[in-house]
Amino acid sequence: MSRVCKVTGKKPMAGNNVSHAHNKTRRRFLPNLQYHRFWVESENRWVRMRVSTKGIRTIDKKGIDVVLADLRAAGEKI
């Protein structure tokens, strides 16, 4: 399963661990993804999505109906 936020599109990114002696080793920065259930009043059902915490804040701000409409317009099956 991919580590991608359904709402924001956040993905893992690469970087370095840097020690006190400035030795660098490669690492991945993973997005803070959560499985979250949202109640969709217009459809009278729960929708379970894998979203980042920023995606949850976006849904709180815009509303789940607007976000779902944007995802469906982009061809996402929900």
From Swiss-Prot:
HAMAP family: Ribosomal_bL28. Disulfide bonds: none annotated. One of its GO terms (cellular component) is cytosolic large ribosomal subunit. Belongs to the bacterial ribosomal protein bL28 family. Pfam families: Ribosomal_L28 (PF00830). It comes from Acidithiobacillus ferrooxidans (strain ATCC 23270 / DSM 14882 / CIP 104768 / NCIMB 8455). Keywords: Ribonucleoprotein, Ribosomal protein. One of its GO terms (biological process) is translation. PANTHER family: 39S RIBOSOMAL PROTEIN L28, MITOCHONDRIAL, LARGE RIBOSOMAL SUBUNIT PROTEIN BL28M. InterPro entries: Ribosomal_bL28, Ribosomal_bL28/bL31-like_sf, Ribosomal_bL28_bact-type, Ribosomal_bL28_sf. This is Large ribosomal subunit protein bL28. One of its GO terms (molecular function) is structural constituent of ribosome. SUPFAM superfamilies: L28p-like (SSF143800).
